[in-house]
Structure formats: C-alpha cells, structure tokens
Amino acid sequence: APGRCQCLATCTNDALKGEAFCKEHMKFCPRSAPLSGSEPRYEPGRWNNDDTVRLTHNCFSYSYNIIDPRQIEACKKDPKCDLPFHQPGSKSGYPRFNNTDPKTCPNMIARLMGDNPKRILPSSFELKCPRGTSKIALVVDEDQDYHFLRQDKPKPGSKTGFFSQKSGAMPVTNLDAKGHKIFDVALADHNFDNSKRKDPLNYDHFCGYFCIPRHDPIFIKTGGSRGELRREAKFKQTRRK
C-alpha cells in the first residue's frame, strides 16, 4: 500500500508513487520546512560508491555530513570492515548501547545534546534554523534502534528541501520505507518491518527536529561492542560548493 500524503497531518489521501504528496497537494502545499541556506547537498554517490565509506558511517554521521578518514583507514586494515559506528552520547560519556535498554526519545535527545552543549537547538518543521545550521530529525524504535535523517539543499529549480537518510551500513537514500520522498519526517513512513531487510525495524516514535552546526567544529565519537575501539574526533564542517 502507498504511504500517506505528507503535506498536512489532516490529509488522509495516499501519496502518489515515489512522491511525498497526494494528487491534490502536488500542485500546492501550504506548509514547508524553511531553509537556512546551510543545508548539505544530496550526494548519494559520495557515501554509496566506496564501501570503506558506506560500511563505516551510519545515520548519525550522515546526518552531520561527516566522513571520518580514521574510519576509512581502519576499514582498510580490517578484512571484514567490522567497526563501531559514531554514536550519540559517546563523546559526553554515556554508556554504550545494549540490547535491553530502550532507545527512548528523552534518552536519545539527552545524548544528542550532551555531545555538543549549546550547539544543537530543538526546532520544529515550520521553524527556520539559524544561519550556519540546518535541520535533522530523530525517530526511534524503542525496543531496537534510533535513526536520524537530515534536510538537504533543494534541487535546482525547486524551493523544497526534502530529507534523506542512511540506515547503518546501507546506502544513502532520499526515500522512506514505502519508497516516497520525505517532506515531513513526522508524517513519512519508517516501518521497515515488511521489507527485505535482515533487521526489521519500525521507527514509530518521532522525537523531533533539531538545528545542528554546519560550518563550526562539532564533536562526535565512535562507540560499539568491538573491544574498546572508541575514537574522539573534532570535525570542521565545510560547505561543499
């Protein structure tokens, strides 16, 4: 079945194939997520074409538009490229994730804000992020996982900044679980339970939108179950022309 129209929460129409909107709202949607001008470009090839990048970066690093050269070098030295991902909360000293602790919105937001105090601002769909920052979104499957998405720069000729995502080591995509463009993360489909994925997930809790720095130094850190391989990194975000 197709996903719902993402224009308005009150619209119950199905979205057109591959689109975020129903037939009625393809012509005009009265709502939009305003752009700050600092949104990253949607460049799936930059993340998907090289396995040392794709296998070592997850939704968190993708939402920050960070490619960590140390992850790539470590992957080249490991035949299986089995490395821990960057995780929210690792920088600020939160314990590693385990299979029993729920990934709730309050817990994940505390981890996100704790890594970069005063740099990350809670936001909303129709609120414009300050210049030099742009919007990401957080959803969770409380039993299993968290997931971040980011708003991208519009395509030439368009004024709409759609969202894109990268699930774990999977390729980057600008479509939701039902193959529709992502206009409003809160109204898009994140139920991967019926897909061919090996790890069925249903991110059924929307935690909110956040504005994150795009040109200032920002901290993230890896953390996982593979020994104590945890590396802190300070990244200078740069605008890609």
Residue ranges and their predicted role:
Residues 17-18, 68-83, 89-93, 115-118, ...:
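Intrinsically disordered, low-complexity coil segments
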Residues 156-241:
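Active-site or metal-binding loop neighborhoods of secreted/extracellular toxin and effector enzymes
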Residues 2-6, 17, 24, 70, ...:
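Disulfide-bonded cysteine motifs in exported proteins
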Residues 1-33, 38:
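Intrinsically disordered, low-complexity regulatory regions of eukaryotic proteins
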Residues 96-170:
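...with weaker cross-activation on analogous glycine-rich loops/strands in unrelated enzymes
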